[in-house]
Amino acid sequence: MVARGASIDVDGVYSNPAGLAFLPKDGFHLSLTGQSAYQTREIHASTPLWTQDGNITEKYYKGTASAPLIPSFHGAYKRDNWVISAGFAITGGGGKASFDNGLPMFDAMAAGLIAQQSQGLVTPSMYDINTAMDGKQYIYGVQLGLSYKINDWLSVFAGGRMNYVKSGYEGYLIAKMKESYGGKTLADLQLKCDQSGWGLTPIIGIDAKLGRWNLAAKYEFKTNLNIENKTDKLLVPDGVPESVLKPYADGEQTPSDIPAYLSVAAGYEILPNLRASVEYHFFDDKRAGMLNDRQKTLTHGTHEYLAGIEWDIVKMLTVSGGFQKTSYGLSDDFQTDTSFYCSSYSLGFGARARLSEAWSIDIAYFWTNYEDYEKSSDNYNGTGMPGTDVYSRTNKVFGLSLNYQF
């Protein structure tokens, strides 16, 4: 079920940690999950800069990311009213994307510099650009916490998550005159920059069981986090502004806070074998520090709305489905080629097969449809020419979990 914030199960280590105190059996509850994800990020860039002949032309850029295995682990030990829980997962970041034909921001920078330095005598039809760019960001999280059942209907949780961020960029751009014009190199850009940092997230939670209702909430405090560059290569043409170079300079530290996060959920038992839930998430992005105070350009934090239903067809088989709507407070100043977001809705479907009293298997599929985001500027990437970028994404995830309790 997509909306897991009020569920009482081993995955509550992340989604509803206070609810772990209401697990029906004492002992160990363990879950090992593997996810397989496929994502694309696409940019349609339209500007007269590409031809400089008075016509607006479009270039298409596509980044792909494929992760055949994304592992995670949830574990809890319950004894009487107490539960100690732990988990490991990739809790954030955009994964890795490879743009085989580069990014428009670097193409535009090269085209603008060539036009400026040649005083317009060298036009795009006279040279070729060979470029590629890879970007990655992963947030690895290790969580530990304690849940306590105060009475028959109320429980609480306190804990924390240690986050380690690993990100970076690697790519190149070489612009050369065509052989018919002599083959001279006009621009050479080389970049290899790794980034890392860590931070601690305090977490609290509460769960209330009221008859057929289960109400739950979780709050993750803002994580103060700086990432530091380890730059092995930073070669750029003369004339590139300092503001472009600074984010990739060796030793440079960049704010990259993880925003505070609130989850509120309600689950209802319609029938003994039929349950439904609704859930709301808020990410306080506007108060999470970013490079150049980029967060201040957002119009609001991120809102997510979720709903789900699950049905025990027979004792040994449960099926589920759900919906998620994600709304970002995006602005043109916030969106960049190396980090852009799109509001979306998602559909998820899953099933659990109970192999025995101790063993069960979960299987799930999650599909996301993104809204295009259009960004227009009269000074496209600082070139003095107009231009428009249309950002879009796709995402498909398949998951499989093996659960064991004893």
Regions found by a protein language model. Give the residues of each.
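N-terminal, post-signal peptide beta-strand-biased segments of exported outer-membrane/organellar beta-barrel
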Residues: 1-93, 340, 366
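Outer-membrane beta-barrel porins/channels
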Residues: 3-8, 25, 70-406
